[in-house]
Amino acid sequence: MNERGMLVDPRFDAFFKLEQIDDYKYDGADTSPSTSNGLPETSNGGRLICDVCGDVAFGKHYGINACNGCKGFFRRSVWSRRQYSCRFGGDCPVVKEHRNVCRSCRLKKCFEVGMNPDSVQNERDRNAKNGGMGGPMSSPTQSSLCKELTISNGQIKRKRLRPETVEKTTQTDGKLEINDDFDFENMQQNPTPPGLLPLKIERISTPPSDLPVPMDFSIHSAVLDIEQKVFYNCPVAVDNSINATKTPITLPFEVVFRQPHLVCNRYPMRFSNTRVLTPEDLIDGWRRHFTYYSDWCHAMDEFKALSPEDQIVLAKKKIILHGWLVHAYYSYKSGCNGICFANGAAHLPEGGHPSITEFYKECMPRYLNYVIYPMHNFQMDDAEMVLIKCIMFFSSESGLSAAGRQIVSAAREKYLSALYNYGRANKCTTSAQATLRIAKFMIMLSAITSLTHLMNEGVHVTSLFNIIEFDELIQATHKTTPPQHSPPAPMG
C-alpha cells in the first residue's frame, strides 16, 4: 500500500503522481493548466464537470474544473485579447451542446466561474522561456514581463510590470514599468508600447448592418403596420362577392397575382362564425385571401427587391402556407374553435356542410391540435403573428436566382432576430425561454406545412370527383411546387 493508504493500479500511477504535485502558484492563485491524462474522476469516484459548459472536465485549468474546449477557448481569447459582442442581450445559455454559439457569453461565463487570466500569461511566459512551446515566441525581455488583466466597461485591459531583478544580459535600467491601457476605439492613434507583441483585435458575432441589433425593436412595428394597412384596405364597402363566386377564373397565377382585383374585390374582411361554411363560401374566401395575400407580398420591401421571376416562384410556393397561418390566427382571435373565413363563414369540427366536412376531414384534427391549440397556449399576439409569417414566407430559397437567395436569406435572419428580440422583451424573462418559444413556433410551422400538403391532395381529389367545383386558378395553385431554376450550363 502506498502513502495514500490504498492500492493504485500501475496504469494510473502517473495520474496520482501528477495530482500530488503542487500546482504552480502565482500570487496565491491556482494557475495550473492541468493536462492530466488520467480518468476525469474526483477522489470519491464522481466525474469532474466543466464549470463553464457542463462537459466532462479533465482536471483544473486556470483555476477551475474545465474541459479542454473551454480551456483552449479561454487561452486563445486572453492571449489574443479578443473582444466579442453578443447579439442577444448578453445572457445566452452556455452549455456543451451550444457553447460555440455565442463567444461573448462564453468568455463572460469563464470569468464569472473564476478562470484566472493571470494563469494564461504565466503559462505563456513559462513556455516562452522554454523555447516558445504553446505560444508565440517572445524575447527574454518580453517573457520576463507579467500581465494583469482586468475587465472594465466591457474591455480587456492589460498591464505589464517588469520585476526589479532582471537578467544581466538585458538589464539597462534598474526598474522599468510599462503601462498599456489600450483604448480599442482609438488604437490607431496609440502606438504599441515598446516590449509588447502586436495585439490581435477581433470582433466576432457582430450583426451585419442589415440585421437588427439587440435593442432594435422597430422591425415588428413596421411589419405590423403593413399588416394593418393591407388588412383594412377595403375600397368595396358592400360584401357582394358571393354573387360572383360561380364565375370560373381561368387566368394563370402569374397574371392575376399582379392584378388581384381580377380574382376578388377587396371587401372588408371579418373572420367570424356567422354562418356555416358552404362550398361557395369556401371558394369566395379563398379568392379574398388571394387578393389579401397579393397586397401583402407587394407591400414587403424584400419581396419588391426580388426579380419578377423570383417573385412569382416565391409567391406561388407560399400562398397556401400563408392562408393556413392567417386563417388560423384570425380564427383564434375570434374565439372560434374551427376555421373562419374573411366572408364571415366558418367550419367547425361538428355540424358542418357535408362536402366541407369531407374536404377538411384529414386536416381538422391536426389544425386544431398543432396550430390553434399552440396559439392559445402561447398567447400569440399580432406582432408575433406577422413576424412568424415573414419567417415562414422567407424560409425557402429553392428555385430562386442567386441574388434572390441572398435577399431571402437575409430577410429570414432579420425577422428571426426580430422575433427573438420581441419575445425576449415582452414574453420571456431569459434568453433560454425566448429561444424555446421560437423553437415551439417553428414546430407549429412544420404542422402548417403538413396541412398544406394535405389540402393540396384534398383539392385534387375533390376536383377529380366533382365534390367541389374548384376553378382552374385554385387547382393550379394547389398543384406541386413550381419548377425550380437550374443553373446555366457551363460554356464550352
From Swiss-Prot:
The protein's name: Nuclear hormone receptor family member nhr-4
Domain of life: Eukaryota
UniProt gene name: nhr-4
One of the GO BP terms on file: regulation of DNA-templated transcription
Record feature DNA-binding region, as residue ranges: 47-122
Membrane-spanning segments: none
Native source species: Caenorhabditis elegans
One Gene Ontology cellular component: nucleus
Family per similarity comment: Belongs to the nuclear hormone receptor family.
Keyword Transmembrane helix: no
Keywords: DNA-binding, Metal-binding, Nucleus, Receptor, Transcription, Transcription regulation, Zinc, Zinc-finger
